[in-house]
């Protein structure tokens, strides 16, 4: 059994989401062959050298899962694209390129965060190309921590404001992009997050049936895609109501 999640947007200000994630790590994920996290794992990430005690506790929780035998794969999102090799090494995770084709029980499946499919949002795509440029990344990683924190707050606030102003179809995937990218990678199944619109969409690519599975964001409830030999099951679950102690708390 394989689990896929995305868009947890983990931050210390949302202990309910953190508790739900830790519950997943201690439960279903222990029985999984692998856990795939397809971006926006953290609400913000300014560099592996700037881990807060809270972020370090999440890293340690992932390491415990990895040490138990579950493989962990992390993909960058638009909020945490500066996650690096140091964090992944400490967490016992493998950094996965976006996009990546993986084999799930004999079927090739395309995994993406999903933001690169939203090509109608031209302003965002320009910003994405700039921020993901290797030179830009090098500069960002070498800025003073205080500057990085201010820049992260500015980008996050601007992103939230712009998203509220944009039409729904602009911030969703571009319909023509989906079959195009699936054909380019030779797959009939695409799994992505980013849009916060969980669903399984049935498609027709040429003469072949296909599907696009959109993972849900963790806000009022959690979402996980379970893959096994019987197929794909996307389901929501309620957050854990009990007041569990967070890692690192007294």
UniProtKB/Swiss-Prot annotation:
Q: Where in the cell is it found?
A: Cell inner membrane
Where exactly are the transmembrane stretches of this chain?
Answer: none
Alphabetical list of PANTHER family matching this protein: UDP-2,3-DIACYLGLUCOSAMINE HYDROLASE, UDP-2,3-DIACYLGLUCOSAMINE HYDROLASE-RELATED
Question: So what family is this one in?
Answer: Belongs to the LpxH family.
What the protein does comes down to:
Hydrolyzes the pyrophosphate bond of UDP-2,3-diacylglucosamine to yield 2,3-diacylglucosamine 1-phosphate (lipid X) and UMP by catalyzing the attack of water at the alpha-P atom. Involved in the biosynthesis of lipid A, a phosphorylated glycolipid that anchors the lipopolysaccharide to the outer membrane of the cell.
Q: Supply the CDD domains for this chain.
A: MPP_YbbF-LpxH (cd07398)
Superkingdom of the organism of origin = Bacteria
Q: Which UniProt keywords apply?
A: Cell inner membrane, Cell membrane, Hydrolase, Lipid A biosynthesis, Lipid biosynthesis, Lipid metabolism, Manganese, Membrane, Metal-binding
Question: What's the cofactor?
Answer: Mn(2+)
Q: What is its EC number?
A: 3.6.1.54
Instruction: Please provide, in alphabetical order, the Gene Ontology terms of the cellular component aspect for this entry.
Output: cytoplasm; extrinsic component of plasma membrane
- Quote the record's binding site residues for Mn(2+) 1: 7, 9, 40, 196
How does it sit in the bilayer? Peripheral membrane protein
Q: What is this protein called?
A: UDP-2,3-diacylglucosamine hydrolase
Predominantly, its location class is: membrane
List of residues binding substrate: 78-79, 121, 159, 163, 166, 194
Q: Give the residues the record marks as binding Mn(2+) 2.
A: 40, 78, 113, 194
Name of the top EC class for this enzyme: hydrolase
